[in-house]
């Protein structure tokens, strides 16, 4: 079982990334919360991992903290919530936001996330109500999400095609292509933003 990897990010195509560990490239899928925490350059990072065995092969998932990885594991144990939906949940809102939705039984906000219907939202509330305690404090050893000043690390410069990359990422997280395009196009200044910032703002708008 692979529990943690330390290396440099060679490629990033949300929600997928390639982590170079001693010359070996590991393909991982990660929630957008992890992408936001990654440094822009070639600084070494540590990702907590979960290995899933599927009928068509294996998939490795990476997370910025152990707490985030543990929350992912709690989510995929809920009936009807697979890894793809769990990634969408952790991409659409952070752990604290998810906890608030559960505590307030906020079905309306949960159903704005891709793949979450009313029944799934209600199941999440019932199943998670007593399971989130102790999961939210961030574990040490993962990639730093913020600088010492409290400001978010700079995102990598956005290449041409950031809009297309953002739409592709939202589709991979479960949004329909038309909805993904609408969310991205609605972001002010979309043409000037790097893809990960564009994804972040589109997801924020989706759950408002």
Curated annotation (Swiss-Prot):
It is found in: Cytoplasm. SUPFAM superfamilies: DNA helicase RuvA subunit, C-terminal domain, Nucleic acid-binding proteins, RuvA domain 2-like. One of its GO terms (molecular function) is four-way junction DNA binding. Residues 139-162 are annotated as: Disordered. Residues 144-157 are annotated as: Flexible linker. GO terms for cellular component: cytoplasm; Holliday junction helicase complex; Holliday junction resolvase complex. This is Holliday junction branch migration complex subunit RuvA. It comes from Alkalilimnicola ehrlichii (strain ATCC BAA-1101 / DSM 17681 / MLHE-1). The gene is ruvA.
